[in-house]
């Protein structure tokens, strides 16, 4: 019965297909193989999209949607793009998270019976971009696969991640706990995530385009074997990946998908890096966001720490900087080696110094991405010429590095890495023209002298004019026809033209080709032979050039690993040189490291803020076992958050390997950096501002260790005063007594300034400010001891709050101060007045009420006064001021 049903279904499908034209049958077959992908179907000079694909592309790419004819009774909707401009349209699609299958004509239209043979040669997806037109120069694009591991009870026990930068061939693996997935994805920022049904729900929203792949692709045993095959090894022990489980399963799925999209092997994926959580300083999503490492809180790329540090001369260096900022090593050994290299670059003699080195680096091409395209056989002519010119410049660059490498082991290692693969430069120099065309199809790519056949074909095509001149001269002499001409047109090709009055002199070997009113056109055997050669020479030259170019790409494949080594060395050298330039230009110093717990920063500065203002006030920060928590008070806008962030940024920069903005800095071990600064509603997640705040605080309290640096800014402000105060007090105590981490704790709760009395490891500091008239001047200096008020009204006035509101607030504040003094209630926060202090006894009786002049001033509204009324009021106030409160009462 089942067989009959299958046969019926096949017959129905065959009947339906027969109703379509042969070309549409071909298209529909290809589309059925890529149902979730937009198929770009090559037709002559255009890529066409049909039916639903056409409608979608027209909407996303702003294309004209047309309708031409019908197939099987269905109108054919079409939209198309020129083949030479397809990359810009693909770039737009990728930004929308869409994928495209590029279907090319692979058959010869002249010999095809029916539709020209076509097939999909590559699939462009958000995570598999390699073409320069689709990539940002300074950002990597990652394809990530996610595999959930389960224990014997079927509960998720770990998550394996494998992510690939297809443009460079860098492959990384990691295994982590399920609750760490969000932080890992925030750090990696994949453009595309591969997941099987049942695990897609594990992916937080907004983390990249999600692609469903079959569950069997994630088989762990198959994935392990596929990794071994890809890396051409018998075991993964040398990469530290043999003990991995779910990560190897993820790697297997990733390699299957990536190879399928490219339609070929991934020849440049030849190494593997296993990332362990303990290897890097932990930075959770909140910390990355609040420290504005690579993106501001407003979502812009500048001003950030990345934008400040990125003076790299190559795109490779800029991309490496982004990676280093998000992966600061915990071990100080790597940072110290980088500091040593920076010092050597700064101390180098002028002829081999920093400026000379950076000038040479500016001539370097993006070797990393060119190598990726080489491995995928998609490198274009100018990629190869750029690679050739870069390799030609490497000997001089190596000499500069060698002159200063004796003072830094890291530079010596990089100098060795900059040696081009043997034979690679020679091949590129011989094969590629000095200034090749952009595309092989345009010709002029292969250098003269590389291939004799190509040179001959070019000579025929290029020397055509001279041959015709020589032939015309010879024929005039042979025939005695002085006005004989040898010419060419597209309709009749080459011909010899003779006027009617001279036709009696035409030799017997002339064959008539065309008769005109006043002339006859002929062709000779010699001219016919030349015509056959000339007309086909250019076409044959282009075909020969294409074949030779493909041969060059194949010949370069054995050099892929050597090119990758050079690219890695260039990127690191460029980044270290950029760090040195920043240190010299911005007056930064080399930090020191110690095994003792502590952070000491002398005259530290916020690197990004300092670059935005004319003058920046430097401040010290000292944290050690006797001083673990700083309670930071002071006015709003006084600089508390800036001081906290600059401490974290200076620590991060030190471990990344950069010099730091300070007079001196010394750091003990740091394992994680936490921030709880600012908050906003998570509407999508159904969480209020206070809930977000408490969630971040909980993560800190649960995970911070004695080696962690914690920034807490105004915790507890999202609820009632007493609740917030109680929470802030308890959190600060817990950080001191249990976590014992380095903590900067900013607050407006005055009661917390009493904490050092209970915990000697806590200390009070404040950001100073002075009142000037009714305004305030922020000094931005960190001083010992607590602040006594927050200057909230003055800050509101600076912010542009209307004057009537400020006056009303000032009046109500005076009322609250009187009420507070009368009831002797404790101060709840720094917006209130300072606590009442017992004054020594004096002979004068205390004032029972506020001064009458002040009361009169608070009653009036200056905006309602006429000039005459204002003058009268001035005399009245003068009189009240001369008399005391007692006189006024009398």
From Swiss-Prot:
> Known InterPro entries for this protein?
DNA_mismatch_repair_MutS, DNA_mismatch_repair_MutS-lik_N, DNA_mismatch_repair_MutS/MSH, DNA_mismatch_repair_MutS_C, DNA_mismatch_repair_MutS_clamp, DNA_mismatch_repair_MutS_core, DNA_mismatch_repair_MutS_N, DNA_mismatch_repair_MutS_sf
Residues bound to ATP are 634-641
Give GO MF terms, alphabetically: ATP binding; ATP-dependent DNA damage sensor activity; damaged DNA binding; mismatched DNA binding
Keyword flag Zinc-finger: no
Q: Which domain of life is it from?
A: Bacteria
Q: Which UniProt keywords apply?
A: ATP-binding, DNA damage, DNA repair, DNA-binding, Nucleotide-binding
The GO cellular component terms are: cytosol
One of its Pfam families is MutS_III
UniProt cross-references to SMART domains, sorted A to Z: MUTSac (SM00534), MUTSd (SM00533)
Transmembrane in keyword set: no
BP term (GO), one:
mismatch repair
Q: Which CDD domains match?
A: ABC_MutS1
The protein's matches in Gene3D superfamilies, at most eight in alphabetical order, are given as: 1.10.1420.10, 6.10.140.430, DNA repair protein MutS, domain I, MutS, connector domain, P-loop containing nucleotide triphosphate hydrolases
Name the family. Answer: Belongs to the DNA mismatch repair MutS family.
- Summary of the function given for this chain in its UniProt record: This protein is involved in the repair of mismatches in DNA. It is possible that it carries out the mismatch recognition step. This protein has a weak ATPase activity.
Protein's name according to its UniProt entry = DNA mismatch repair protein MutS
> What gene codes for this chain?
mutS
């Amino acid at each position: 019965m089942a067989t009959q049903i299958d046969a019926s279904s096949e017959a129905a499908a065959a009947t339906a297909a027969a109703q379509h034209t042969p070309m549409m049958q071909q298209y529909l077959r290809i589309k059925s193989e890529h149902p979730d992908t937009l198929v770009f179907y090559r037709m002559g000079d255009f890529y066409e999209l049909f039916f639903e694909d056409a409608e979608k592309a027209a909407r996303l790419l702003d294309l004209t949607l047309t309708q031409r004819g019908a197939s099987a009774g269905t109108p054919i909707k079409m939209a198309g793009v020129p083949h030479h401009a397809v990359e810009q349209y693909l770039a737009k699609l990728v930004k929308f998270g869409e994928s495209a299958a590029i279907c090319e004509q692979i058959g010869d239209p002249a010999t095809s019976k029916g539709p020209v043979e076509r097939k999909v040669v590559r699939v462009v997806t958000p995570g598999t971009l390699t073409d320069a037109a689709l990539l940002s120069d300074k950002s990597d694009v990652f394809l990530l696969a996610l595999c959930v591991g389960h224990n014997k009870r079927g509960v998720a026990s770990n998550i394996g991640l494998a992510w690939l930068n297809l443009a460079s061939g860098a492959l990384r693996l990691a295994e982590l706990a399920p609750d760490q997935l969000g932080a890992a994805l925030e750090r990696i920022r994949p453009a595309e995530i591969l997941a099987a049904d049942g695990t897609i729900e594990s992916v937080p929203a907004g983390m990249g385009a999600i692609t469903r792949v079959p569950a069997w692709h994630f088989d762990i045993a198959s994935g392990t074997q596929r990794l071994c095959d890809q890396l051409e090894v018998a075991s993964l022990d040398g990469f530290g990946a043999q003990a991995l489980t779910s990560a190897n399963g993820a790697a297997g799925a990733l390699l299957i998908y990536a190879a399928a999209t490219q339609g070929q092997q991934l020849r440049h994926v030849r190494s593997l890096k296993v990332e362990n959580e303990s290897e890097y300083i932990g930075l959770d999503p909140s910390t990355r966001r609040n420290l504005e490492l690579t993106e501001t809180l407003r979502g812009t790329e500048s001003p950030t720490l990345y934008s400040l540090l990125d003076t790299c001369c190559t795109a490779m260096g800029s991309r490496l900087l982004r990676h280093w900022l998000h992966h600061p090593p915990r071990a100080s050994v790597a940072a110290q080696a980088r500091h040593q290299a920076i010092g050597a670059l700064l101390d180098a003699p002028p002829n081999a110094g920093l400026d000379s080195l950076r000038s040479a680096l500016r001539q370097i091409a993006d070797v990393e991405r060119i190598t990726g395209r080489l491995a995928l056989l998609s490198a274009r002519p100018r990629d190869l010429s750029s690679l050739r010119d870069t390799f030609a410049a490497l000997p001089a660059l190596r000499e500069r590095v060698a002159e200063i490498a004796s003072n830094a082991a890291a530079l010596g290692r990089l100098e060795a890495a900059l040696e081009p693969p043997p034979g690679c430069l020679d091949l590129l120099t011989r094969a590629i023209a000095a200034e090749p065309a952009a595309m092989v199809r345009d010709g002029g790519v292969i250098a003269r002298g590389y291939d004799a056949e190509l040179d001959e074909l070019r000579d025929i095509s290029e020397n055509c004019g001279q041959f015709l001149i020589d032939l015309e001269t010879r024929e005039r002499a042979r025939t005695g026809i002085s006005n004989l001409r040898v010419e060419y047109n597209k309709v009749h090709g080459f011909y010899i033209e003779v006027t009617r009055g001279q036709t009696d002199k035409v030799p017997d070997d002339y064959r008539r080709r065309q008769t005109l009113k006043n002339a006859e056109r002929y062709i000779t055997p010699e001219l016919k032979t030349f015509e056959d050669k000339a007309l086909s020479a250019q076409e044959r030259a282009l075909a020969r050039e294409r074949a030779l170019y493909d041969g060059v790409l194949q010949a370069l494949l054995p050099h892929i690993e050597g090119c990758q080594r050079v690219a890695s060395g260039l990127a690191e050298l460029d980044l270290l040189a950029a760090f040195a330039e920043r240190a010299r230009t911005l007056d930064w110093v080399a930090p020191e490291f110690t095994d003792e717990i502590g952070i000491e920063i002398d005259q530290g500065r916020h690197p990004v803020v300092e670059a935005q203002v004319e003058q920046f006030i430097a401040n010290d920060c000292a944290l050690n076992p006797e001083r673990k928590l700083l309670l930071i008070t002071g006015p709003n806008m006084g600089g508390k958050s800036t001081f906290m962030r600059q401490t974290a940024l200076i620590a991060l920069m030190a471990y990344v390997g950069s010099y730091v903005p300070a007079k001196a800095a010394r750091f003990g071990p740091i394992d994680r950096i936490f921030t709880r600064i600012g908050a906003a509603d998570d509407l999508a997640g159904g969480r209020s501002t206070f809930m977000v705040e408490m969630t971040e605080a909980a993560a800190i309290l649960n995970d911070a260790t004695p080696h962690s640096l914690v920034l807490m800014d105004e915790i507890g402000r999202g609820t009632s005063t007493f609740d917030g105060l109680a929470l802030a007090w308890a959190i600060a105590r817990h950080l001191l007594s249990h976590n014992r981490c380095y903590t900067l704790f900013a607050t407006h709760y005055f009661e917390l300034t009493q904490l050092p009395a209970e915990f000697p490891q806590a200390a009070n500091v404040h950001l100073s400010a002075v009142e000037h008239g009714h305004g305030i001047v922020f000094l931005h200096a960190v001083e010992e001891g607590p602040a006594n008020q927050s200057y909230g009204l003055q800050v509101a006035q600076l912010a542009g709050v209307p004057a009537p509101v400020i006056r009303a607030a000032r009046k109500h504040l005076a009322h609250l101060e009187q009420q507070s003094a009368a009831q002797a209630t404790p101060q709840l926060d720094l917006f209130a007045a300072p606590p009442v202090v017992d004054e020594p006894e004096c002979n004068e009786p205390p004032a029972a009420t506020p001064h009458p002049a002040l009361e009169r001033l608070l009653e009036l509204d200056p905006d309602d006064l006429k000039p005459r009324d204002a003058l009268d009021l001035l005399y009245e106030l003068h009189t009240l001021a001369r008399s005391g409160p007692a006189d006024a009462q009398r």
